[in-house]
């Protein structure tokens, strides 16, 4: 009898451990996610800054295995620089987002280089303007906790940065005027587990 009880206890612990170690899927909170950008204007005279607020997707995190994935869908029509005329130009010009032809951008990557239980990079591919290129995100901050306002959920938040060359994606407007094609990105996301 004791051996059966011990075996059952061991099985219970194994199942519980497996459950704790299982990958957890977090849905992007669209109200707390955006991609910020900073781009050159006239070869270093000034900077264009803005955000793209239409970001959704999911993060799958397995802290035990130190692994996970990120999938983001980005709506370039939500670009906001604080200037309506510039926003319209960015949305419509064939050498910028051209949202009529390319209504979404996507980023798919793998969480990597975990330190103290948290990833420090995402190694993935960005598809934008019909072109796919490898882009690595450097994670500056990544934290998870019980949601402070929704007791049946957990929440993770992350800040990351990357640099791209927009010419790599066929977005070359301004090059003939001396614009640098480099763009710095600042990504902020929060993601929550689905309601239980």
Where are these regions (language model features)?
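Low-complexity, acidic/polar, glycine-enriched regions of mature
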Residues: 21-196
């Amino acid at each position: 009898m004791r051996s059966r009880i011990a075996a059952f206890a061991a099985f219970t612990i194994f199942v519980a451990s497996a459950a704790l170690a299982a990958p957890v899927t977090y849905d992007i909170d669209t109200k707390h996610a955006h991609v910020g950008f900073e781009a050159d204007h006239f070869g270093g005279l000034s900077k264009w800054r803005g955000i793209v607020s239409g970001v959704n997707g999911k993060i799958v995190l397995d802290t035990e295995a130190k692994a996970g994935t990120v999938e983001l869908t980005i709506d370039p029509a939500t670009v906001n620089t604080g200037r309506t005329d510039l926003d319209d130009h960015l949305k419509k010009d064939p050498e910028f987002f051209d949202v009529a032809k390319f209504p979404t951008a996507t980023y798919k990557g793998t969480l990597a280089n975990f330190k103290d239980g948290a990833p420090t990079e995402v190694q993935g591919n960005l598809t934008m303007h019909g072109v796919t290129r490898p882009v690595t995100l450097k994670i500056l901050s990544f934290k998870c906790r019980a949601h402070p306002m929704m007791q049946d959920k957990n929440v993770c938040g992350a800040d990351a940065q990357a640099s791209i060359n927009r010419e790599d994606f066929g977005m070359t407007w301004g090059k003939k005027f001396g614009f640098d094609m480099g763009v710095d990105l600042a990504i902020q996301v929060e993601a929550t587990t689905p309601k239980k």
